Design a protein with these regions (language model features):
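Structural signature of alpha-solenoid helical repeat junctions
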Residues: 29, 68, 104, 142-145, ...
Length: 181
Protein backbone atom coordinates (compact mmCIF):
# COMPACT_ATOMS: atom_id res chain seq x y z
CA UNK A 1 0.00 0.00 0.00
CA UNK A 2 2.84 2.41 0.83
CA UNK A 3 4.36 1.96 -2.63
CA UNK A 4 0.96 2.54 -4.28
CA UNK A 5 0.55 5.77 -2.31
CA UNK A 6 4.04 6.88 -3.33
CA UNK A 7 3.11 6.29 -6.96
CA UNK A 8 -0.15 8.19 -6.47
CA UNK A 9 1.55 11.21 -4.89
CA UNK A 10 4.08 11.15 -7.75
CA UNK A 11 1.19 11.12 -10.26
CA UNK A 12 2.23 7.72 -11.60
CA UNK A 13 -1.37 6.64 -11.84
CA UNK A 14 -0.91 3.51 -13.93
CA UNK A 15 1.66 2.09 -11.52
CA UNK A 16 -0.59 2.98 -8.59
CA UNK A 17 -3.54 1.30 -10.29
CA UNK A 18 -1.58 -1.92 -10.82
CA UNK A 19 -0.95 -2.10 -7.07
CA UNK A 20 -4.26 -0.76 -5.71
CA UNK A 21 -6.64 -2.93 -7.74
CA UNK A 22 -5.53 -6.27 -6.27
CA UNK A 23 -5.35 -4.74 -2.79
CA UNK A 24 -8.91 -3.48 -3.12
CA UNK A 25 -10.15 -6.87 -4.32
CA UNK A 26 -8.44 -8.65 -1.46
CA UNK A 27 -8.99 -6.24 1.45
CA UNK A 28 -11.75 -3.77 0.44
CA UNK A 29 -9.83 -0.55 0.93
CA UNK A 30 -11.25 2.39 2.85
CA UNK A 31 -13.22 5.06 0.92
CA UNK A 32 -10.30 7.45 0.46
CA UNK A 33 -8.04 4.77 -1.03
CA UNK A 34 -10.89 3.66 -3.28
CA UNK A 35 -11.21 7.29 -4.37
CA UNK A 36 -7.51 7.20 -5.24
CA UNK A 37 -8.22 4.06 -7.24
CA UNK A 38 -11.04 5.88 -9.05
CA UNK A 39 -8.64 8.74 -9.86
CA UNK A 40 -6.21 6.22 -11.37
CA UNK A 41 -9.01 4.69 -13.44
CA UNK A 42 -10.02 8.17 -14.62
CA UNK A 43 -6.49 8.87 -15.83
CA UNK A 44 -6.46 5.49 -17.58
CA UNK A 45 -9.68 6.49 -19.42
CA UNK A 46 -11.58 3.67 -17.70
CA UNK A 47 -14.52 6.00 -17.20
CA UNK A 48 -17.27 3.48 -16.50
CA UNK A 49 -15.25 1.84 -13.74
CA UNK A 50 -14.16 5.24 -12.36
CA UNK A 51 -17.82 6.30 -12.23
CA UNK A 52 -18.78 3.15 -10.35
CA UNK A 53 -16.15 3.82 -7.70
CA UNK A 54 -16.64 7.60 -7.46
CA UNK A 55 -20.41 7.21 -7.11
CA UNK A 56 -19.86 4.67 -4.34
CA UNK A 57 -17.23 6.53 -2.33
CA UNK A 58 -18.02 10.25 -2.73
CA UNK A 59 -20.97 10.10 -0.27
CA UNK A 60 -18.58 8.54 2.26
CA UNK A 61 -15.98 11.30 1.86
CA UNK A 62 -17.85 14.31 3.18
CA UNK A 63 -15.19 14.84 5.88
CA UNK A 64 -12.28 15.41 3.49
CA UNK A 65 -10.97 18.84 2.52
CA UNK A 66 -13.38 20.71 0.24
CA UNK A 67 -10.86 21.06 -2.57
CA UNK A 68 -10.10 17.33 -2.54
CA UNK A 69 -13.82 16.56 -2.68
CA UNK A 70 -14.24 19.03 -5.55
CA UNK A 71 -11.61 17.13 -7.54
CA UNK A 72 -13.51 13.88 -7.05
CA UNK A 73 -16.74 15.55 -8.19
CA UNK A 74 -14.88 16.99 -11.21
CA UNK A 75 -13.42 13.63 -12.25
CA UNK A 76 -16.75 11.88 -11.74
CA UNK A 77 -18.52 14.54 -13.82
CA UNK A 78 -15.81 14.42 -16.50
CA UNK A 79 -16.18 10.65 -16.68
CA UNK A 80 -19.91 10.94 -17.30
CA UNK A 81 -19.24 13.75 -19.81
CA UNK A 82 -16.72 11.59 -21.69
CA UNK A 83 -19.37 8.85 -21.92
CA UNK A 84 -21.87 11.43 -23.22
CA UNK A 85 -24.11 11.06 -20.16
CA UNK A 86 -24.52 14.81 -19.80
CA UNK A 87 -27.62 14.62 -17.60
CA UNK A 88 -25.60 12.63 -15.05
CA UNK A 89 -22.56 14.93 -15.30
CA UNK A 90 -24.53 18.14 -14.74
CA UNK A 91 -25.36 17.76 -11.01
CA UNK A 92 -21.79 16.70 -10.26
CA UNK A 93 -20.35 19.86 -11.83
CA UNK A 94 -22.90 21.83 -9.78
CA UNK A 95 -21.80 20.09 -6.56
CA UNK A 96 -18.18 20.85 -7.40
CA UNK A 97 -18.69 24.61 -7.83
CA UNK A 98 -19.05 25.67 -4.16
CA UNK A 99 -16.05 23.53 -3.19
CA UNK A 100 -13.48 24.37 -5.85
CA UNK A 101 -11.10 27.30 -6.17
CA UNK A 102 -12.24 30.36 -8.09
CA UNK A 103 -9.75 29.77 -10.91
CA UNK A 104 -11.23 26.28 -11.45
CA UNK A 105 -14.82 27.47 -11.81
CA UNK A 106 -14.51 28.59 -15.46
CA UNK A 107 -13.89 24.98 -16.54
CA UNK A 108 -16.92 23.75 -14.62
CA UNK A 109 -19.17 26.47 -16.05
CA UNK A 110 -17.83 25.68 -19.51
CA UNK A 111 -18.80 22.02 -19.14
CA UNK A 112 -22.15 22.96 -17.57
CA UNK A 113 -22.84 25.12 -20.61
CA UNK A 114 -22.33 22.13 -22.86
CA UNK A 115 -24.47 19.89 -20.63
CA UNK A 116 -27.35 22.38 -20.92
CA UNK A 117 -26.74 22.82 -24.65
CA UNK A 118 -26.88 19.06 -25.24
CA UNK A 119 -30.03 18.88 -23.08
CA UNK A 120 -31.58 21.62 -25.26
CA UNK A 121 -30.72 19.68 -28.41
CA UNK A 122 -32.12 16.49 -26.91
CA UNK A 123 -35.37 18.07 -25.72
CA UNK A 124 -35.75 19.94 -29.01
CA UNK A 125 -35.35 16.72 -30.97
CA UNK A 126 -37.81 14.84 -28.75
CA UNK A 127 -40.36 17.66 -29.00
CA UNK A 128 -40.00 17.67 -32.77
CA UNK A 129 -40.37 13.88 -32.93
CA UNK A 130 -43.49 13.93 -30.76
CA UNK A 131 -45.03 16.64 -32.91
CA UNK A 132 -45.39 18.99 -29.95
CA UNK A 133 -46.92 22.30 -30.94
CA UNK A 134 -45.16 24.07 -28.07
CA UNK A 135 -42.21 26.11 -29.19
CA UNK A 136 -39.58 24.08 -27.35
CA UNK A 137 -40.21 25.45 -23.87
CA UNK A 138 -37.69 23.23 -22.12
CA UNK A 139 -35.32 23.50 -25.07
CA UNK A 140 -35.40 27.30 -24.81
CA UNK A 141 -34.86 27.12 -21.05
CA UNK A 142 -31.87 24.83 -21.49
CA UNK A 143 -30.39 27.14 -24.13
CA UNK A 144 -30.81 30.07 -21.73
CA UNK A 145 -29.05 28.11 -18.96
CA UNK A 146 -26.28 27.16 -21.40
CA UNK A 147 -25.77 30.81 -22.33
CA UNK A 148 -25.64 31.82 -18.65
CA UNK A 149 -23.05 29.13 -17.92
CA UNK A 150 -20.92 30.13 -20.89
CA UNK A 151 -21.11 33.78 -19.74
CA UNK A 152 -19.96 32.81 -16.23
CA UNK A 153 -17.22 30.71 -17.78
CA UNK A 154 -16.04 33.60 -19.96
CA UNK A 155 -16.06 35.95 -16.98
CA UNK A 156 -13.92 33.49 -15.01
CA UNK A 157 -11.47 32.86 -17.84
CA UNK A 158 -11.00 36.60 -18.36
CA UNK A 159 -10.50 37.22 -14.64
CA UNK A 160 -8.37 34.21 -13.62
CA UNK A 161 -6.97 32.56 -16.73
CA UNK A 162 -6.54 35.20 -19.42
CA UNK A 163 -3.28 33.74 -20.74
CA UNK A 164 -2.02 33.01 -24.26
CA UNK A 165 -2.83 29.32 -23.69
CA UNK A 166 -6.50 30.14 -23.06
CA UNK A 167 -7.05 32.59 -25.96
CA UNK A 168 -8.62 29.92 -28.18
CA UNK A 169 -10.96 28.80 -25.38
CA UNK A 170 -11.99 32.40 -24.70
CA UNK A 171 -12.68 32.98 -28.40
CA UNK A 172 -14.68 29.74 -28.58
CA UNK A 173 -16.82 30.74 -25.60
CA UNK A 174 -17.53 34.13 -27.15
CA UNK A 175 -18.70 32.37 -30.32
CA UNK A 176 -20.85 29.97 -28.28
CA UNK A 177 -22.51 32.89 -26.49
CA UNK A 178 -23.08 34.66 -29.80
CA UNK A 179 -24.70 31.55 -31.23
CA UNK A 180 -27.07 31.29 -28.28
CA UNK A 181 -28.51 34.82 -28.59
Amino acid sequence: LARALDYFSSEKFHECLVLLQPLNRRYKLNPRYRAYLAVCLYYEWEYAEAIRLFDEVIPQLQGVAPHELSLYYWMDAESYFALQQYDRALPLYEKMLPLCRDNEKPDAYYRLGFCHLFAAESSGASEKASGSSESSGSSAEERKKAKECFELSLEGYLKYRNTPNEKARIAQIRHMIGGLK
